[in-house]
């Protein structure tokens, strides 16, 4: 009887251990998600979570990725600084679990190469394309304020990266605010000139977020996920030529475009959020509320994953 009881206990414990890893991990990424793309191509998540089936879903930007996360069709994703702020303001239940710091070089305000506009201040009254609720939204707001302008001083047209590129090339907008690799692609092909980037504007970086139900059910897996992302990032730093070639082939981009993007990236490691990250993100959220761009104040700290 004792042996039967012991076997039952061992079976239960084994079941709990197995439950610590999800049966499926659904990952949302963008063309800008270097670490995720490399992790996918090198099957790093499959190695880190051997009992887990990994599914990859590509998105054109952070806002649609957030929608998928909220709709229950995604577990984790990589986004810029503004999508999670908009998500919190909309009552979406997600958690920040890691950050990839940047230096503000991976996104820019672009104008046509032949444009007479030489400064952000000269965009007053002009039409500017960007994706609403994206990191480009933040870059442009801060760029305007630095130039002494207000949001109302320009005519912002909300467009996806692909539609923004088309409008930009057709002369339907005077400027386009976008992130890499779209930014590098427009500059490399000679159609765009950089009016300004995010340097000096205290960018918070890009974030890795998880749906709260997943975080609550599999908190032990988050550490392994962060380590895997950090490993993928190290590959991009330690093997840049190989990583550039792989990214170019995988995403269908010119190697010169990916090389430019890599040159804009920060070597800072992917890691759990620290007080400085939360503080930067909170100041950005407060700025968006003060400018009427989100409907209510948000508390960033409330959405930060707490490791068990």
Feature roles, as predicted:
Residues 82, 153-249:
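Pocket-lining segment of extracytoplasmic ligand-binding domains
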Residues 25, 125-130, 173, 213, ...:
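Second-shell loop/turn segments in exported
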Residues 21-150, 156-158, 174-178, 194, ...:
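Short, glycine-/small- and polar/acidic-enriched structural segments
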Residues 286-308:
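Conserved C-terminal helix/tail region of periplasmic/extracytoplasmic solute-binding proteins
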Residues 14-16:
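N-terminal signal peptide c-region/cleavage motif recognized by signal peptidases
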Residues 216-293:
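Secondary-structure end/capping motifs
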Residues 42, 66, 70, 81-84, ...:
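Extracytoplasmic/secreted envelope proteins and their assembly/folding machinery
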């Amino acid at each position: 009887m004792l042996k039967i009881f012991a076997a039952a206990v061992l079976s239960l414990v084994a079941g709990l251990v197995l439950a610590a890893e999800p049966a499926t991990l659904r990952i949302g990424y963008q063309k800008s998600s270097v670490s995720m793309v490399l992790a996918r191509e090198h099957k790093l998540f499959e190695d880190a979570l051997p009992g887990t089936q990994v599914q990859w879903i590509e998105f054109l930007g952070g806002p649609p990725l957030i929608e998928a996360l909220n709709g229950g069709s995604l577990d984790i994703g990589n986004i810029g600084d503004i999508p999670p702020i908009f998500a919190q303001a909309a009552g979406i239940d997600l958690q920040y679990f890691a950050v990839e710091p940047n230096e503000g070089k991976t996104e820019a305000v672009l104008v046509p190469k032949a444009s007479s506009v030489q400064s952000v201040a000269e965009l007053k009254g002009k039409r500017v394309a960007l994706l609403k609720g994206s990191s480009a939204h933040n870059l442009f707001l801060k760029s305007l304020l630095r130039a002494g302008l207000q949001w109302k001083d320009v005519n912002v047209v909300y467009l996806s990266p692909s539609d923004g590129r088309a409008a930009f090339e057709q002369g339907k907008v005077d400027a386009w605010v976008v992130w890499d690799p779209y930014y590098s692609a427009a500059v490399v092909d000679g159609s765009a000139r950089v009016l300004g980037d995010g340097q000096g504007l205290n960018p918070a970086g890009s974030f890795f977020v998880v749906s709260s139900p997943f975080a609550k059910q599999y908190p032990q897996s988050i550490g392994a996920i962060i380590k895997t992302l950090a490993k993928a990032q190290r590959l991009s730093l330690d093997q840049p030529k190989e990583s550039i070639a792989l990214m170019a082939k995988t995403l269908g981009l010119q190697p010169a475009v990916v090389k430019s993007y890599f040159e804009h990236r920060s070597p800072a490691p992917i890691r759990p959020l620290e007080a400085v990250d939360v503080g930067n993100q909170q100041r950005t959220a407060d700025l968006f509320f003060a400018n009427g761009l989100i409907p209510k104040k948000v508390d960033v700290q409330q959405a930060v994953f707490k490791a068990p």
